[in-house]
A protein has these predicted regions:
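Polybasic, lysine/arginine-rich low-complexity segments
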Residues: 2, 21-23
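Short His/Asp/Glu-rich catalytic/ion-coordination signatures at enzyme active sites or charged loops
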Residues: 35-50, 99-118, 141-183, 243-283, ...
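Hydrophobic residues within well-ordered, non-membrane alpha-helices that form the packing/core
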Residues: 55, 59, 66, 126, ...
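N-terminal helix-rich structural modules
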Residues: 24-219
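Bacterial N-terminal signal peptides that target proteins for export
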Residues: 1-8
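Repetitive helical segments and hydrophobic/amphipathic motifs
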Residues: 11-12
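Active-site-proximal, well-structured secondary-structure segments within enzyme catalytic domains
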Residues: 158, 190, 197, 201-243, ...
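C-terminal motif of bacterial Sec signal peptides marking the signal peptidase cleavage site
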Residues: 16-19
Length: 461
């Protein structure tokens, strides 16, 4: 009777746990079919706490799909190996892609902490796939027979690219080398996340706060207005705040007559993650460089540059340096000429031609105004954001026949806007999100990413 009770209890608990998992999947939008317009991510339903469970569930599902490919007893073919691999992992890919891009565009402390676990987890999962010898032997079997399988050009390229990915991921290494590579990849994943978190923290930590109108001498009214708005957003009404984001920093460096303030802002930017504090990245950079070299040598390359470029257009570091060398001398000569022009203006104004890095933007603007009578502020009304966007749309239409129309879909931030992109026949091509402005949780720079890439299955897009 005791055994029966224990067995009954175990069955009940298993049922309850299964129900809990099922309920979790049902309540996690990243694990559901995206029934949104055009299948875009349901940003209005996604919460930070959804990401880690979704990635973990995606990994389990992907593992089962890989296991099915490995255990398939049929002769390896394009369909049951290469195509099956290409179709696998969709749930994981969707969840991790949304997480990665949102962590770059709308990050927070919870997401950054989760990333320290999620990215190494995904890195280890990828290693478990690409370093799986049984799986690789199936890929290799198809690759070796590719010329005799009547593959079309797309199938042939996918086969070759799949094989190359396995090889570049370490599939040809010995078992001991594979274990070493796994450890390196895990460390690199963690260090990469920490580097990015530190940089974002330092970008957000510094502000140049100005509380006197006279300290804004030379700064155009439009730039002052933006700095005033930034101050209001930070609950510092009546002041002006400049940050290390390029749209805030570069205009100040270009127009401010206060050399000491230009120096302060410029040095703050230059010294990010380099002050010996908790966000200092020097040791992280050293460790990344050492691990990359170790990985490259493990893979049979003399340097990480040689490994990274082997699959790129340049092919070798020597080719890359040869191109840079061609550009270096003429670029240097032009820079010297521009420097002399700027120093001449500085000497005429101040009697001193000594020059520092934080003077460059300021005097470059003066040279431009003197030589070409060009004042960028006068162009501002013609180059408003709306005008520039419409100009891009019109040019794209003239070149490729594509059109853009505003569309109402879920977005991840109130400043984000979306457009449906249509081809010359007015057929749907995709959804384009615009997110123009810097903010504390957003990675700096001009960058873009894809939430869902185009794919065809059985001839259907």
């Amino acid at each position: 009777m005791k055994n029966l009770s224990a067995l009954t209890f175990l069955m009940i608990m298993t049922t309850l746990l299964s129900g809990c998992k099922s309920k979790q999947a049902e309540s996690n939008p990243l694990l559901e079919t995206w029934s949104t317009p055009f299948g875009v991510p349901p940003f209005d339903k996604i919460k930070t706490e959804h990401f880690k469970p979704a990635v973990e569930a995606g990994i389990r599902l992907h593992e089962a799909q890989i296991d099915s490919i490995v255990k398939n007893t049929e002769t390896p073919s394009f369909g049951n190996v290469i195509e099956a691999l290409d179709r696998s992992g969709e749930v994981l890919n969707n969840a991790y892609t949304v997480f990665s891009l949102l962590n770059s565009a709308e990050s927070n402390d919870r997401m950054q902490a989760d990333d320290m676990e999620i990215s190494p987890l995904v890195s280890a999962h990828n290693d478990n796939i690409y370093l799986n010898d049984r799986l690789f032997q199936k890929v290799k079997a198809v690759y070796d027979q590719r010329e005799y399988l009547s593959l079309d050009p797309q199938q042939l390229r996918l086969t070759e690219q799949t094989y190359k990915r396995f090889v570049r991921a370490g599939a040809l290494l010995t078992p001991a080398q594979k274990e070493q590579l796994k450890k390196i990849n895990e460390q690199l994943s963690r260090l990469g996340v920490q580097f990015g978190n530190n940089l974002l923290a330092d970008n957000n930590a510094f502000t140049l706060v100005i509380d006197k109108q006279e300290d804004l001498a030379g700064v155009p009214a439009s730039i002052q207005s933006a700095a005033s708005t930034e101050a209001v957003n930070r609950k510092m009404e009546g002041k002006w705040v400049f940050t290390l984001s390029k749209p805030s920093m570069i205009p100040f460096l270009s127009y401010s007559e206060r050399r000491d303030l230009r120096e302060k802002l410029y040095k703050a930017y230059l010294e990010r993650c380099n002050r010996g504090d908790s966000t200092d990245n020097k040791q992280i950079v050293n460790e990344i460089a050492k691990l990359r070299l170790e990985k490259a040598r493990l893979m049979g390359y003399p340097s990480y540059g040689a490994f990274a470029l082997d699959d790129e257009m340049a092919q070798t570091p020597e080719n890359a340096y040869a191109l840079l060398d061609k550009l270096w001398q003429p670029s240097l000569e032009l820079a010297k000429k521009e420097l002399e022009e700027m120093k001449a203006i500085k000497k005429a104004e101040t009697g001193d031609d000594s020059f520092e890095s934080w003077d460059w933007w300021y005097y470059a603007e003066k040279v431009r105004k003197q030589k070409y009578d060009l004042n960028e502020e006068m162009l501002r009304p013609y180059l408003s954001l709306d005008n520039v966007v419409q100009g891009i749309f019109q040019l794209s239409n003239r070149l490729w026949g594509i059109t853009f129309r505003p569309v109402s879909v879920p977005v991840y931030h109130k400043e984000c806007i979306a457009y449906e992109v249509l081809d010359k026949d007015n057929k749907h091509l995709g959804i384009l999100y615009f997110d123009f402005f810097p903010r504390p949780g957003k990675q700096g720079g001009a960058w873009c990413g894809a939430y869902r890439e185009e794919r065809y299955e059985e001839g259907k897009r």
